[in-house]
Amino acid sequence: MPLFSIIIPVYNVQNYLSACVKSVVEQPGPRDWECILVDDGSTDQSGAMCDALAAELPGLKVIHRENGGLAAARNTGLKAATGDWLLFLDSDDAMAPGLLAQLRGALAAHPDCDWFIGTHLEWQPDGTLTPHDGLHLVPGPFASSDYAARLKALYTAGHWSVWKYCIRRSFLEQARVRFLPDCVWAEDWPFDLELLLHCDRLYFLDTVFTHYRVGRQGSLLTDAKNLPKRFRGLAAAQRRLARLSANGTADAAAYAAMQDAAADVFWPQARTAAVRDAAIRKACLPYIEQLRPLYPHGTEVRTRRDWRLFQWMMQTFGPKFTLWAASRR
């Protein structure tokens, strides 16, 4: 049984895939890992490249599936994983050199921990690597029975990005947490919110896990036409959070903390939708009207004057007028 299972969802990344896979294969140390490439119905040469790489390089497994989105592809990889520990990597990014060697040391030093969290570097279009300004990670263990405290620690360490996690597979199986297939954007955060209910000990490592490529055109993060998909994902995540509250998995305090975190995801997207073209605003509006009453505030909204003004306009004049007014600026 391998020590690590590295899950890489693949979709239309023919220009980046080889570099991503080789960043795993070229890790120094024993071949105590498996790398699972999940081709999510790519329409370019990515699927064929997966097969060619698996034929050429050791340790690779390839799964081809119909297109279902990043969350569904990660779930497919989880189902196939056999390693003791799980790592995730996006197919346009790269694993940091020497990561697995550093993780072997961390796992041996902290055998009682189920969830390790590291850092990343931003991979700029010109090839340079820069630290992410939003990271405020304090290395070391963090334990608390207070869900809100655990959530704050995770959020402060750089939000929720599974490609800088190392998670014990048996812990994840016992928690029975999976990615939400209907959440086609930012699928990490509902996964994290739910998994955090089952884990009262985190370990923050001052270790770079990933070189995260920024500014790639056509991604869900950079393409404006994907804004409606983001709101559909937010609505799906909200339904999941409501079920966790209804079935008692999340108590009242935990649910309130989840909603506060969800607000910090919702409000920036609502503000972004306000300044896009009319068709995008029209597609986003039903989701904004549905979700806005659930998120009266968020920490980001409370700390910036423009967010407070935008929130006041939404509450006073309603989404339609606010989106129209923002589009006229």
Model regions and ranges:
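Short, well-formed alpha-helical segments that are part of the catalytic scaffolds
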Residues: 13-26
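A conserved acidic beta->alpha catalytic loop
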Residues: 23, 39-49, 66
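Short beta-strand/loop segment that forms part of the nucleotide-sugar
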Residues: 32-41, 61-66, 91
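Glycine-rich, basic loop-to-helix element that forms the pyrophosphate-binding segment
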Residues: 65-81
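Donor-binding/catalytic cores of nucleotide-activated saccharide
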Residues: 70, 91-202, 210-228
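Short aromatic/hydrophobic "clamp" motif used to bind/position activated sugar donors
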Residues: 86
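Catalytic core of nucleotide-sugar-dependent glycosyltransferases
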Residues: 207-216, 222-252, 268-269, 274-295
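Membrane-interface aromatic/basic loop that binds lipid-linked glycans or pyrophosphate carriers
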Residues: 274-329
